[in-house]
């Protein structure tokens, strides 16, 4: 009982990137700029899709919701990370606050990954079954797929968060990270975590491999269908749309796999923190850039909106 009470009252601190205040301030400015850029880019996509009736199609519906997910995803960790940078690692987070941050980060990140599968399915139907596209991709199905992505993210996040915070935490209160990531928090537990690490690895493998396999299968059929398109313009348009999605998938799944599927023996906290910067800050910036720069309809809608202002 005493151990449980100690754990409940614990506070965690995040290890600074550098002991030099000037370096910390520089990283703070970089993180803040990346965060604001991510917010601006993703909010722009969501608003452009909403106000432009020509973009009210399933593909852009999913793209807009992906942008909204990215906003909440980065916002679940950035404010605390920025406060920690300013305080040189002296900003505490309670165990409840850490668990809450982990839950929302995994929930939104999981929903993000599932939504990428949904977007691949949408493109598969659009390219391989164009005549039946409107019949298959009804608005009711689109909403169901979106809600399903959120539900799966929730069902992934809740048991993982409970699994990790069921562990006892003792004297070591410094998290070698800039947010409450699962492997980093688990390293602070004063108990045997082999079962927990194995469970996390198995769940991560299933959660990452199944969606990635479904996306890969979809794109095998899509590539075959694109090669059959006689029009060079049609092939180029299909290729441009699909290549944008593939780039986003590679960024998201590549970074996540490195963090959660690396063997414990070869896991480097420092490298894990660097890679985490890529998929928590850089990927949400690149997503709107990749989609907007490679999508003619979205670029045209953005130009029209800018001309109005």
From Swiss-Prot:
Q: Which residues form a coiled coil?
A: none
Arranged from A to Z, the UniProt key words for this protein are: Cell membrane, Disulfide bond, G-protein coupled receptor, Glycoprotein, Membrane, Olfaction, Receptor, Sensory transduction, Transducer, Transmembrane, Transmembrane helix
Segments on the Extracellular face: 1-25, 76-100, 162-198, 260-272
**Which CDD domains does the UniProt record give?**
7tmA_OR10A-like
Q: Where in the cell is it found?
A: Cell membrane
Q: Name one Pfam family in it.
A: 7tm_4
Q: Give the sugar-modified residues.
A: 5
Coarsely, its chief localization is: membrane
Membrane-spanning ranges: 26-46, 55-75, 101-121, 141-161, 199-218, 239-259, 273-293
Q: Which InterPro entries match?
A: GPCR_Rhodpsn, GPCR_Rhodpsn_7TM, Olfact_rcpt
According to the UniProt topology, which residue ranges lie Cytoplasmic?
47-54, 122-140, 219-238, 294-309
Q: Name one GO molecular function term.
A: odorant binding
Q: Does the keyword Signal apply?
A: no
| Cystine bridges | 98-190
Question: What is the membrane topology listed in the Swiss-Prot or TrEMBL record?
Answer: Multi-pass membrane protein
Gene Ontology terms, cellular component aspect?
plasma membrane
| Family indicated by similarity | Belongs to the G-protein coupled receptor 1 family.
Q: State what this protein does.
A: Odorant receptor.
Query: What's the protein name?
Result: Olfactory receptor 10V1
């Amino acid at each position: 009982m005493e151990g449980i009470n100690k754990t409940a009252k614990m506070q965690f601190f995040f290890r600074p990137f550098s002991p030099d205040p000037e370096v910390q301030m520089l990283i703070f400015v970089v993180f803040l700029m990346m965060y604001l850029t991510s917010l601006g880019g993703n909010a722009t996509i969501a608003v452009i899709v909403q106000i432009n009736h020509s973009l009210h199609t399933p593909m852009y519906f999913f793209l807009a919701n992906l942008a909204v997910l990215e906003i909440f995803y980065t916002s679940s960790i950035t404010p605390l990370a920025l406060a920690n940078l300013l305080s040189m690692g002296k900003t505490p987070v309670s165990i409840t606050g850490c668990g809450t941050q982990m839950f929302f980060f995994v929930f939104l990140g999981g929903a993000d990954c599932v939504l990428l599968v949904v977007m691949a399915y949408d493109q598969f139907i659009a390219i391989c079954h164009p005549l039946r596209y409107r019949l298959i991709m009804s608005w009711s199905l689109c909403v169901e797929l979106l809600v399903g992505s959120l539900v799966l993210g929730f069902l992934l996040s809740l048991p993982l968060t409970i699994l990790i915070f069921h562990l006892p935490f003792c004297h070591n209160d410094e998290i070698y990270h800039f947010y409450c990531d699962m492997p980093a928090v688990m390293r602070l537990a004063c108990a045997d975590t082999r079962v927990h690490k194995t469970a996390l690895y198995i769940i991560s493998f299933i959660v990452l491999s199944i969606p990635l396999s479904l996306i890969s299968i979809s794109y095998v059929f899509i590539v075959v269908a694109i090669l059959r398109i006689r029009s060079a313009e049609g092939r180029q348009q299909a290729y441009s749309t699909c290549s944008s999605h593939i780039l986003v998938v590679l960024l998201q799944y590549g970074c996540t796999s490195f963090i959660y599927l690396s063997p414990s023996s070869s896991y480097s906290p420092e490298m894990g923190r660097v890679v985490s910067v890529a998929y928590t800050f850089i990927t949400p910036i690149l997503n709107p850039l990749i989609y907007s720069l490679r999508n003619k309809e979205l670029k045209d809608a953005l130009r029209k909106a800018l001309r109005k202002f």
